[in-house]
Amino acid sequence: MSAPEPKITPELIASHGLKPDEYQRILDLIGREPTFTELGIFSAMWNEHCSYKSSRIHLKGLPTKAPWVLQGPGENAGVIDIGDNQAVVFKMESHNHPSYIEPYQGATTGVGGILRDVFTMGARPIACLNALSFGDPSHPKTRHLVSGVVAGVGGYGNSFGVPTVGGQTRFHTRYDGNILVNAMAVGLADSDKIFLAAASGVGMPIVYLGSKTGRDGMGGATMASAEFDEGSEEKRPTVQVGDPFAEKLLLEACLEIMAKDCVIAIQDMGAAGLTCSAVEMGAKGDLGVDLDLDAVPTRETGMTAYEMMLSESQERMLMVLKPEKEKEAEEIFRKWGLDFAIVGYTTPTKRFVVKHGGAVKADLPIKELGDEAPLYDRPHVPSPKLPVIHAREVNAPMPVPEALEKLLATPDLCSKRWVWEQYDHVIGGNTLQRPGGDAAVVRVEDGPKGLALTVDVTPRYCEADPYEGGKQAVAEAYRNITAVGGKPLAITDNLNFGNPERPEIMGQLVGCLKGISEACIALDSPIVSGNVSLYNETSGRGILPTPSIGGVGLLDDFTKSATLAFKAEGEAILLIGETHGWLGQSVYLRDVCGREEGAPPPVDLACEKRHGDVVRGMIHAGTATAVHDLSDGGLLVALAEMAISGNIGASLDAPPDSTVAHAWWFGEDQGRYLVTVKEDDLLTVLSKLKSVGVPCTQIGTTGGHTLKIDGERAIDVKALRHAHEHWLPDYMAGKN
């Protein structure tokens, strides 16, 4: 006999993250008091994480269509066509709150969840990326969180067998109490064999696949829709536990039943577990769903209907099966050692009915749970405009060479080798460009094509000016893909913000989305998938607005690509784009001058497109021997990275007389690239760039073992490498 369900009280309602008006909406909708299980189901489906109730109205303005887009937002992942009946399936998603509470398991299950989103669509994962945001290095928890998250990302990806090929790692005090772990997965599928979540047909069996259900992850989606407070450590039991080896078996079994044409619809059990997957499949197919929880495989005794519906145990799928394929599908899953159980059927009623122990535990209208959750147009105010920082008003606290060495050893600009060397970035044998460059390049098997992959955002820009920051995040992804020779095709986004009930935070989200939308349109990069993570606050202190952008581009011929390393001595170094010395919100202004202030650099999207097309053309023509986009740290940091990577120095001209030297070298003007060309090609290249109206300046020549600016002290490339490589391993070893 099951235990009596708790009485529905205002305290119980509030603990489920439901506001009084939302509970009243439930009463109006079903005409009675909900059962405890029904309250849990509404809590899961109507929270921010699953319903997007604060952001959905603004997400509708994003560009999502293009001739090459096969599937846009609304499914498990986005899909783009790359020709030859090949499709790229990709998405990025957050696992922020769990990773702060339990960094290893939070990160592992973040990777596992995004991999399932991709292979649920019928794709074999070929790469993972991530964007990690940690607190101030001096904060007592930061080192522990970095260690746990990086180990978790590597532990899952390495064991599952997918390379982790790129990402971002940043540090800022605003992430002290709320780190960000954004995971991106990319897979390949046949264009004509994409599997979706919408159920079809009445009386079709609904099958539970994968690992057994336990109590781990209880209320995870609701936790991800609330602010943290001082008691957040007590939420450790709500963090899911991942098993990458079980996920590998699930991948192979799912791809096998898909190849055998067994599947009508399929959905992974992620946030809100069985509840969300069943509701979404039924609602998208305009059908009802009847579930019998007595058939659900469990690994703990005495689980209630409430617990089974809200468990977020990992490595599980829900599938609507072709009835005639039941025996064949079951044999496949048994072969792989995984559970296979028919737990329900589709119905024509448009009701979501859950039974357990012979009793009905939930009977709810399915569309209102899924497609028609509450929708808010929350008050929002624009961020105040910050003044432009004029370079001549900023005193240089140290000579340029010393400033460069200091910047290369800062937490944000130092080499992240310590991070990515813990990831297997070459498993599968298709990684052509490893982490540490502008974008990763992964070979598409059985042909000449490659994929360029990147993750980008500059949160301090988004804080200072959300609109320009949103534009810049997309533009930098565009530049990074271009810099390796890829044609940018589409993006996935992961929008991380604070409490949307605060108008200034909602204003950041609205402003960033406006900038992202404009940039996507101008740069022909539609958004095909994404995730929104709100309430990233602890005790009222929010994170920096962090709309991570995951970009995917195509190389028709991966041999026509570029890297950032200087290749040979005696080559001309060209600066493409205009340099005005914009110091506002620059890393130099913050970390050398001690001033985190000013308006961020504006982004001219027409110039971004024009400059990108020209650079890509140079790479494909073979005239560009090395390419690097300019971003954090500006011109001299980018030059140092090229020198370090190629182990070749450079002689650099002094800045133009009309500029301020430190602003010329460290300003963060947008739309710029560094390109090296052979002396024999120089005049032809300069003439070509002039004819198409793209600004270009020769600023030096490669050669030697030092980076030498005319009139300044030379710095040995070995010294630059030491500065660049040592901060992070020393920090993790407790030496700084």
Curated annotation (Swiss-Prot):
Mg(2+) 1 binds at E93, N531. The keyword rRNA-binding does not apply. One of its GO terms (biological process) is 'de novo' IMP biosynthetic process. The active site is at H49, H95. It is found in: Cytoplasm. Pathway: Purine metabolism; IMP biosynthesis via de novo pathway; 5-amino-1-(5-phospho-D-ribosyl)imidazole from N(2)-formyl-N(1)-(5-phospho-D-ribosyl)glycinamide: step 1/2. Part of the phosphoribosylformylglycinamidine synthase complex involved in the purines biosynthetic pathway. Catalyzes the ATP-dependent conversion of formylglycinamide ribonucleotide (FGAR) and glutamine to yield formylglycinamidine ribonucleotide (FGAM) and glutamate. The FGAM synthase complex is composed of three subunits. PurQ produces an ammonia molecule by converting glutamine to glutamate. PurL transfers the ammonia molecule to FGAR to form FGAM in an ATP-dependent manner. This is Phosphoribosylformylglycinamidine synthase subunit PurL.
